[in-house]
Amino acid sequence: MQALVIVGHGSHLNPGSSEPAYTHADTIRESGAFDEVREAFWKEEPSFRNVLRTLESDEVYVVPLFISEGYFTEQVIPRELRLDDFDPDDWDSDGTDADHVTLEADDVEKTIHYCGPVGTHDSMSEVIVQRASSVTGREEFGDDFGLAVVGHGTERNENSAKAIYYHADQIREMGVFGEVQAVFMDEDPEVDDVTDFFDTDDIVVVPLFVSDGFHTQEDIPEDMGLTDDYRTGYDIPTAVDGHDIWYSGAVGTEPLAADVVLERAADAGAPVGDAVDAVREQTRGANAAAGD
């Protein structure tokens, strides 16, 4: 038997923090790609520490629903899963290309395929573009539309910014938008000044966050000038400094993000069959239905 475990941060304060993990788990569960699909969290139950004990499968694919490589993916998750032989160097990553490593969890007698985070997978760029399509209702953009990919940014983890720049570069090479920029909450270039970085009339702003919470629902809209008080709401798009800003909310809530989880497991050797294509078709259908 084979199992998939999606591990997320969770929150004691924001019940929506875990929602993407449950939603994407349900999507993958319906595909039938795995005998078991579980969710586990740092700040909620079921916990990282106990999740492996809930599985009957002897082979487990663990996919972190995190944006970047760093403290949680390199220290907390391996420690809590008791992957004693894990070494971040085994990923041979420069901060954006962690793949997977196979280890034994001896206390539960299971083989664990520990994957890199969803946020640095190549296919996340496609999810960002799809998120932009979902908020604008457009399948094509062209030179009149710019895209701002928003990250948290932090001096404590340089990989946090690397993931944002990585996807901004990839999307720029796709030629989908007239302009593509990476911006941040806590470092330059700052999201507060997003209109300064674009000549396009329309700017789609997509936060590379797993879930919607205080940053995506309160801080970023106010920082960009969409509203003085998030509680009063704002229009989509909102005119700011001569530009129309289309703000999408967290990319991790996009249904297509389930595909990234599945692709991470497939890259680690999970025999998912045609589940990737099935999930892509299902999640794109969800987007179309939402736009009706």
Curated annotation (Swiss-Prot):
It is an enzyme of class 4 (lyase). It comes from the Archaea. It catalyses: Co-sirohydrochlorin + 2 H(+) = sirohydrochlorin + Co(2+). SUPFAM superfamilies: Chelatase. Pathway: Cofactor biosynthesis; adenosylcobalamin biosynthesis; cob(II)yrinate a,c-diamide from sirohydrochlorin (anaerobic route): step 1/10. InterPro entries: CbiX-like, Sirohydro_Cobaltochel/CbiX. GO terms for molecular function: metal ion binding; sirohydrochlorin cobaltochelatase activity. Transmembrane segments: none annotated. GO terms for biological process: cobalamin biosynthetic process. Gene3D superfamilies: 3.40.50.1400. Co(2+) binds at H152, H215. Residues 1-141 are annotated as: CbiX 1. Keywords: Cobalamin biosynthesis, Cobalt, Lyase, Metal-binding, Repeat. The keyword Amino-acid biosynthesis does not apply. The keyword S-adenosyl-L-methionine does not apply. Belongs to the CbiX family. CbiXS subfamily. Catalyzes the insertion of Co(2+) into sirohydrochlorin as part of the anaerobic pathway to cobalamin biosynthesis. Seems to consist of two fused copies of the CbiX domain, resembling CbiK arrangement. This is Probable sirohydrochlorin cobaltochelatase. It comes from Halobacterium salinarum (strain ATCC 700922 / JCM 11081 / NRC-1) (Halobacterium halobium).
